[in-house]
């Protein structure tokens, strides 16, 4: 992939933050994106995607569109691809000028914000088809489905088999992941062996959405969360309660005990492949380069750690939606139903090297069939994935959590830092009337 999932994580919050500011100025439907109809009665529907420069995924999407256009004459879908770095701002600008396309892709965590801001329309009449997709690939808000994606990725641990074997460390499985105590003992043994510069690398040098995507699942495994998901009105008790404080102390101890660097190097994956690190916290996107490396036979892919409430990993990647102001919503929905056939889920996920969103599609993609070499990543996603908080306020929550987690790693008092984060998050939710 030209644009890796890790790179994509860096830009998630910007568009939602822009949507938040635009919606505050006047929430409502982004109408005005009329479908043009030619002399033969064929309506042209515009489709926007973030995949300019991401040749393999764009080619797969273009094939879906070509097949759809060739299957009927009532609608014609036209693709416009944007560079990822400018895509989100292009969407929010189009929403402000009421010129959104009928069909567009959207990053999963942004869906609640864009739906609340009036950008997106519910995918009415598609519930049965959507029910076959991994829950983390469906963008739902206020009880309605607004988006659905072809794929997801999974957070994993990559470990050197030799480091585990030489130190008598059990290889964990989905059914029996490492416990908190086992993980601590494993790190202590690896460090004591003196063979590794880093027993663990959590990629703390990464920026942006990586922090809430990668580290809030550990908070959730302890029993805390970023906000109370019952009503999304307050983070009190979730982000500053005993479980959250325990998470904060544990997270910082990984650095103070010398198990992982306070700030990882410029390329943690390469550090792992070069023998500097014994265990790398990474995503399923790291499997392909690991298997192509000189140490492929000494690498094992593991589930995340159970810190008390079961392993948790972040869920939700790019998804497809219909805009609220589309003048031919029946055409946009017709395309969506066609495009989400299992064969297209398979072709797009294969092109991107990601986890297919349906069981039938997974059976078509080499490696993701039951028992295939990548099937474990799909099982991790099925069993452990938790989508980020389904509230339009998520962008603020994400940046607040990032700052708080960084402050804690750098020595801030955990309780005080978490209490301040709760105050800030609650104030933001309340200032927006809890996005009601």
What kind of feature is each model-predicted range?
Residues 139, 302, 350-400, 432-436:
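Long, aromatic- and glycine/proline-rich binding clefts that accommodate carbohydrate-like moieties
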Residues 184-191, 229-262:
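Glycine-centered hinge/linker elements that transmit conformational signals in sensory
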Residues 50, 111, 214-217, 245-328:
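Extracytoplasmic/periplasmic substrate-binding proteins
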Residues 121-135, 173-178, 198-209, 222-246, ...:
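Short, solvent-exposed loop/beta-turn-alpha elements that line the ligand-binding surface or hinge
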Residues 107-158, 211-214, 218, 300-302, ...:
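Hinge/lid segment of periplasmic solute-binding proteins
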Residues 165, 383-436:
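Conserved C-terminal helix/tail region of periplasmic/extracytoplasmic solute-binding proteins
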Residues 146-150, 155, 181-233, 277:
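Extracytoplasmic/periplasmic solute-binding protein
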Residues 2-113, 128, 307-309, 330-331, ...:
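Conserved N-terminal structural module of periplasmic/extracytoplasmic solute-binding proteins
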């Amino acid at each position: 992939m030209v644009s890796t999932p890790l790179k994509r994580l860096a830009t998630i919050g910007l568009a939602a933050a822009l949507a938040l500011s635009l919606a505050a100025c006047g929430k409502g439907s982004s109408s005005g994106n009329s479908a043009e109809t030619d002399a033969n009665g064929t309506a042209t529907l515009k489709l926007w995607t973030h995949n300019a420069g991401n040749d393999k995924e764009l080619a797969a999407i273009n094939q879906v569109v070509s097949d759809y256009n060739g299957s009927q004459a009532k609608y014609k879908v036209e693709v416009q691809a944007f560079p990822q770095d400018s895509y989100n701002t292009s969407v929010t600008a189009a929403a402000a000028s009421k010129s959104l396309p009928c069909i567009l892709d959207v990053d999963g965590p942004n869906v609640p914000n864009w739906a609340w801001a009036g950008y997106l329309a519910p995918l009415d009449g598609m519930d049965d088809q959507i029910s076959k997709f991994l829950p983390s690939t469906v963008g739902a808000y206020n009880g309605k489905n607004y988006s659905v994606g072809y794929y997801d990725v999974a957070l994993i641990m990559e470990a050197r088999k030799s480091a585990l074997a030489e130190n008598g460390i059990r290889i964990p499985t989905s059914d029996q992941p490492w416990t908190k105590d086992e993980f601590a003992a494993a790190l202590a043994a690896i460090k004591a062996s003196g063979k590794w510069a880093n027993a663990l690398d959590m990629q703390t040098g990464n920026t942006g959405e990586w922090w809430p995507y990668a580290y809030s699942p550990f908070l959730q495994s302890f029993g805390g969360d970023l906000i109370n998901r019952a009503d999304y009105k307050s983070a009190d008790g979730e982000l500053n309660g005993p479980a959250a404080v325990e998470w904060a102390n544990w997270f910082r101890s990984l650095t103070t005990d010398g198990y992982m660097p306070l700030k990882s190097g410029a390329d943690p994956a390469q550090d792992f492949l070069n023998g500097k690190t014994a265990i790398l916290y990474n995503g399923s996107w790291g499997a392909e380069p690991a298997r192509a490396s000189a140490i492929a036979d000494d690498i094992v892919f593991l589930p995340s750690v159970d810190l008390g409430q079961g392993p948790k990993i972040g869920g939700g990647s790019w998804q497809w939606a219909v805009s609220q102001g589309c003048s031919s919503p029946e055409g946009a929905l017709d395309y969506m139903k066609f495009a989400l056939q299992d064969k297209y889920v398979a072709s797009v996920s294969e092109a991107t090297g990601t986890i297919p969103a349906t069981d039938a599609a997974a059976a078509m993609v080499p490696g993701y069939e039951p028992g295939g070499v990548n099937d474990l990543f799909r099982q991790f996603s099925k069993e452990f994935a938790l989508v980020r908080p389904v509230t339009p306020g998520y962008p603020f929550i994400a940046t607040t959590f990032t700052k708080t987690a960084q402050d804690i790693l750098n020595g801030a008092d955990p309780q005080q830092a978490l209490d301040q984060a709760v105050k800030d998050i609650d104030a933001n939710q309340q200032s927006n009337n809890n996005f009601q």
